[in-house]
């Protein structure tokens, strides 16, 4: 599927989610030989048996390599930065002893732009579409002339070839033919399209090229499927815009140059943090696929993937968490993300739940106990990386109460204080935050039907937010706010210590009647994962309590390919007592391996110094490792992308991975690995090196950018300890070590191009 700006408003190509086959329609290249043999380098849709086939996903591109009867094709798809076009780079090799004459057909089915409108009324709006061939641009043009309030923004689609186009079709039904589908289009079988433009119906782009690949030789061409804007429904303006936008795109060397731009972008993004560790699978995940996944999630929030249809917009808490992982690689991007999120906060301190910056619809108001609590950790992460405390005084308007526009102006710091006030004004009978609609666990709101339920998870979040803000206040001399934060934190910690500890683990909360949730006597869901990890993230409780909670997790929730969200799952649907109705046992929030929540357990174990357990939890969820353990046919998700959850025990689909790419797992797995397992992270007082390693690792290396300095960090572990730094130096000069951590002051890096750091771990 391809879209411009919004997959809801400006969807360019069709994708039929949930239908079989699940990956259709796609971007198809048909290769036809003179004898009528037809095949595709992507295998689908033709499904002709190939002599050789491979697919390789790389950062920013996908490469298919296939061979049939002496013709080898390398097909690369990518979108260059700064270009609103999907490039199809086609390279052909001929290993036969004679020249090969081939017909190539590039095909994509177009959408009607507005996906929801297409579902509701596409049988009318199909009369408002037009396709035609623009010979000057050597491109097929697709124009939607359905008038809308944002008509001027609607793009014009073009589909061009770098080679002469011998025939074309802009009409799907004409290209495919009656009673057929994409595996055998009548135009491909006939060896020619009908040069059919579209005045009404179902649009597509189909371009036909005739090529001759010499014996032992090569041939190369490319296609671009892209958009131009500002055409205002005019055919003349559309043609002018397409000709101008594509002037350089047809040149033979253009794909190479644009691919270099793409590679440079990813190289710069990766260079912010790279590691060398003894585990090659973990190293590849940390160095390559974690940052790729975090970019995807930060760009698209939870709105769109092969299952999500694009209607969810931008989740507030989702994007706030995604931006924490972006902050140390691209702080400017994270700052812009935070500014937008603050514009979606109400003056009372709470926030919207979902917003739609590109979809021309109002934000979705839904009072939850956690959304606003993700702001403080994001701000803290940005300040730790940039030390730009001037951000605190920037003014950003609140959102109007009816979500229709801007409210009163406030500084970033005032936004943070408003978030604290909202939680302080919404505490329950035990002094814990009221659950409201829900907290991070959406279904926990079912324990709160009358509005009197309380959440321990949000209580721990509140403590962490207060600690982060207190640190910032201390650094910036805001003494009155510091005193207030400390008072709020002390009260919340006291409430948690008095009412959240169940004897062997931390409770999940309280229902409307004041009954504990996540207690040893609960009906289902006796033990929840999140309170155990977040007690440690927030620094609440004694060491004995923290260890006990995580030991309970290891004993009851670890199933070898992840930690279940709770145990035992709720099992019935016929009474209010079975609160998590809807999800079957082992699914979603009812006992699945919720990978996002696993990340906090990894951080918790690393904080406690349990390196063996922390790395076990990390490595057992790496997609490649899950596939090796369970099998690809069971897991059914990509080997290069984190998933949201994996179906747990008690369900016949146990091991099935769900919701890949657009998940909070990506950001937090990246944070867990780089900042807590490898232990190199920015804090307000400098760069910390605080690794937590497996005992068999004797040395690792981390290369990181900090305050404009390229830092090379050698971490030695000659005694095979899990945690604890005993010696450190920067540029050959000793640095003090405190409580097993090496803290390198910001002054060491400012104005320095490169700095080498050495850290030695040992027994404290």
Locate predicted features.
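Aromatic-rich carbohydrate-recognition surfaces in CAZymes
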Residues: 314, 318-319, 323-431, 455-463, ...
């Amino acid at each position: 599927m391809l879209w411009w700006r919004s997959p809801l408003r400006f969807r360019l190509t069709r994708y039929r989610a949930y239908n079989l086959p699940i990956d259709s329609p796609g971007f198809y290249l048909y290769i036809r030989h003179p004898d009528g043999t037809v095949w595709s380098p992507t295998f689908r849709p033709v499904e002709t048996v190939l002599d050789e086939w491979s697919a390789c996903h790389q950062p920013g591109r996908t490469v298919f390599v296939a061979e049939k009867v002496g013709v080898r094709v390398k097909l690369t798809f990518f979108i260059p930065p700064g270009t609103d076009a999907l490039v199809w780079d086609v390279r052909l090799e001929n290993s036969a002893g004679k020249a090969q004459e081939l017909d190539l057909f590039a095909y994509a089915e177009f959408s009607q732009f507005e996906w929801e409108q297409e579902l509701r009324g596409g049988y009318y709006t199909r009369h408002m579409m037009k396709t035609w061939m623009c010979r000057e641009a050597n491109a097929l043009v697709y124009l939607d002339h359905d008038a809308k309030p944002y008509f001027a923004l609607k793009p014009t689609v073009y589909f061009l070839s770098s080679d002469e186009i011998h025939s074309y079709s802009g009409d799907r039904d004409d290209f495919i033919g009656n009673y057929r589908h994409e595996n055998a289009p009548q135009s491909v079988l006939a060896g020619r399209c009908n040069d059919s433009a579209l005045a009404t119906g179902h649009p597509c782009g189909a371009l036909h090229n005739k090529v001759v690949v010499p014996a032992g030789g090569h041939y190369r061409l490319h296609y671009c499927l892209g958009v131009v804007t500002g055409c205002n429904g005019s055919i003349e303006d559309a043609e002018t815009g397409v000709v101008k936008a594509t002037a350089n795109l047809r040149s033979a060397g253009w794909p190479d140059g644009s691919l270099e731009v793409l590679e440079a972008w990813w190289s710069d993004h990766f260079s912010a943090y790279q590691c060398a560790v003894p585990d090659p699978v973990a190293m590849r995940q940390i160095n390559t696929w974690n940052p790729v996944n975090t970019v995807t999630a930060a760009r698209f929030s939870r709105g769109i993937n092969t299952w999500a249809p694009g209607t969810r917009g931008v989740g507030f808490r989702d994007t706030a968490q995604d931006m924490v992982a972006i902050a140390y690689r691209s702080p400017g991007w994270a700052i812009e993300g935070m500014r937008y999120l603050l514009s979606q906060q109400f003056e009372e301190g709470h926030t919207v739940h979902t917003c739609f910056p590109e979809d021309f619809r109002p934000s979705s108001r839904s009072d939850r106990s956690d959304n606003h609590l993700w702001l403080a950790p994001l701000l803290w992460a940005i300040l730790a990386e940039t030390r730009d405390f001037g951000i605190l005084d920037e003014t950003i308007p609140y959102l109007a109460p009816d979500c229709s526009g801007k409210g009163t102006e406030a500084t970033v710091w005032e936004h943070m204080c408003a978030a604290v006030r909202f939680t302080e004004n919404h505490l329950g009978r035990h002094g814990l935050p009221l659950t409201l609609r829900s907290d991070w666990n959406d279904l926990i709101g079912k324990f709160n039907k009358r509005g009197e339920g309380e959440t321990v998870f949000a209580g721990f979040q509140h403590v962490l937010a207060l600690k982060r803000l207190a640190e910032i206040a201390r650094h910036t001399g805001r003494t009155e706010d510091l005193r207030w934060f400390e008072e709020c934190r002390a009260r919340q910690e006291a409430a948690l210590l008095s009412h959240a500890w169940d004897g062997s683990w931390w409770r999940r909360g309280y229902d409307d009647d004041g009954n504990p949730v996540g207690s040893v006597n609960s009906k289902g869901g006796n033990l929840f994962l999140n309170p155990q990890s977040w007690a440690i993230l927030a620094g609440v409780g004694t060491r004995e309590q923290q260890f006990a909670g995580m030991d309970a997790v290891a004993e009851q929730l670890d199933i070898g390919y992840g930690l279940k969200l709770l145990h035992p799952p709720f099992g019935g649907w016929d009474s209010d007592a079975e609160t998590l109705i809807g999800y079957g046992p082992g699914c979603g929030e009812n006992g699945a391996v919720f990978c996002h929540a696993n990340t906090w357990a990894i951080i918790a174990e690393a904080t406690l110094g349990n390196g063996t357990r922390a790395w076990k939890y990390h490595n057992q969820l790496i997609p490649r490792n899950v596939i090796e353990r369970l099998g690809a046919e069971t897991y059914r998700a990509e080997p290069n992308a984190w998933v949201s959850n994996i179906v747990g025990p008690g369900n016949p689909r146990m091991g099935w991975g769900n919701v890949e790419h657009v998940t909070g797992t990506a950001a937090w797995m990246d944070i867990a690995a780089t900042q807590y397992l490898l232990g190199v992270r920015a804090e307000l007082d400098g760069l910390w090196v605080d690794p937590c390693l497996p005992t068999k690792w004797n040395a690792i290396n981390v290369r990181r950018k900090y305050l404009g300095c390229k830092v090379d960090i050698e971490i030695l572990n000659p005694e095979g300890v899990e945690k604890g730094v005993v010696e450190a130096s920067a540029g050959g000069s000793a640095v003090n070590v405190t409580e097993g951590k090496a803290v390198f002051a910001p002054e060491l890096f400012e104005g320095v191009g490169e700095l080498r750091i050495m850290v030695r771990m040992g027994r404290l």
